[in-house]
C-alpha cells in the first residue's frame, strides 16, 4: 500500500496529514508558531524557523507516530499561506524576514507610487485588479527601496510554498494559481517571465519557473531527506497556496462551487468556467485545468475572535489554563445566548484594514450601537455577524452583479468549530452552507493531490467520489430578514466613515 503526505504552513499554525490510497487519514499532526509584528502594519515570518522548521518537524512526527515506512510514501504535497514574499540566495537560504500577505501594509507607499505612475486603468490591466497589499510585486519593490543590498543579492523572490519546494528538491518553481499574485511580472497567458515589466521591480532571473500545482517538481534530495525524515528520491509536487489546497480538500472542483475558508482571515474561492473581470476581486486561473477562480479575502475572521478572547475573556483564558473549558467554547456559548442581530450592535471587522472588496489597508474596526445593556457576549455575537456580512457581500458580487450561479457553499477552517458562526453565515446570506466530511484543511487537500499525482486516482472526477459532505446548515429566514434590513447600515458605516478612518492613520 502507498501513502501520501500533505503539509500546510499557515499564519499561526501548521498542519500535516498522512493518508492511504483511499484517502483515509492514517495520522495527523500540528504545531503552532509566532507571527512577528515588529511595527504597526508589519507582519512577517522567519522563513527558516517557521516555514522550513515546521515542515521538518511535522514530516518527522507523522512518519514516527504513524509507524509507516517512509519509503512507502509515494508522493509529497505541500501548501502554505500565499501572497507572501521572501528573498533567498542560490541555496534557498532566506535573506530577510518574509513579508506576509495582505495583512502586512508596509508596501502601501509602493502601491500608491505604482498607481500614480501607471494610472488606475493601466494598473488594473497589469495586476488584474486594483493593486493591493496582497500583491507580491509591490513587496519586491519595497525590498528594492528599503533593503537594496538584500534585493541585489537575492537569487529569487519566493512565496512560501515555492520556498518549501526548493528546500525539498532544489528547484525554484511556483504554480500558476500563486503566480497570479506576482502579476505583472509574468505574462498571464504564456506564464513566462515578462522581462519588460520586471524592469521596474527586479531582474527577470529572480523569478521562479511557473508550473502546475499538481506537477511533480522533482524528488527529495539527500540533504532534505536528512532534515525531514523522508526518503531521498520521493516525488514532490510543485505545491500551491493554502486557500487553493483547502478548496480542494472540501471537494470544490466544479464551476459553481464556492469555498469560504474561516481561518485567521477569511478567504473565498468561487469556481467558474471562464475568466471573470472584476478589479475589486482577484480573478485568475485555478488549480484544476479548465477552471478559473474568483478569489477574494478579508483581513480578519478568526483573528478577531482571538483578539476578543485575549482582551475580553481573560478570565476564561485563565480558567482554561487551570483545566477549565476552552475559552473559545465559552465565547460561543455566550454568543448563543444572544439573539440574532445582537440587540442592535453591529461590528465592522476591519481590525487590520480590509482586502476585498474594499481594498483599503487603512479601514478600521468599529463596534456601532453600543449601549449600557450590551455585554461582552453581544460583542462576540456582533463580531461573528460582521464577518458573516463580509461573506454575504462577496456572494452578492458573484451572483447579483456577475450573474453567476452558486451551486453550493462549502465552509472550512477553524471557524467550522463554532456552530453559531456557521449559522450566522447561513442566515445573513439566506442560503444553505455545508461542511465537508473531512475538515482537516489544506494539508488534506495537499495529500489528496499527491494521491492523484501519484497514480492512486485516474482523474479529478474519480477523486471526487471519495469526498463527501458531513453537515448542511439551513438558514433561518426570519433571522435573514432581520439581517437584510440592517445590511445597508453595515455597508454605510464604512462608506460614511472611510475618510475619518484614514485621518486616524
Describe every region a protein language model picked out.
Residues 64-102, 130-134, 161, 165-186, ...:
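Short beta-strand-loop/turn "lid" adjacent to the catalytic site in phosphate-handling enzymes
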Residues 16-18, 23, 76, 104, ...:
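Conserved small-residue
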Residues 201-214:
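A conserved helix-loop-beta module that forms one wall/lid of the active-site cleft
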Residues 32, 101-102, 299:
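A generic structural motif
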Residues 86-88, 109-113, 246-248:
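Pocket-flanking alpha-helical
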Residues 1-97, 125, 153, 222-226, ...:
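N-terminal glycine/serine-rich phosphate-binding loop of ATP-dependent small-molecule kinases
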Residues 100-117, 447-448:
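Short alpha-helix plus adjacent loop in nuclease-associated cores
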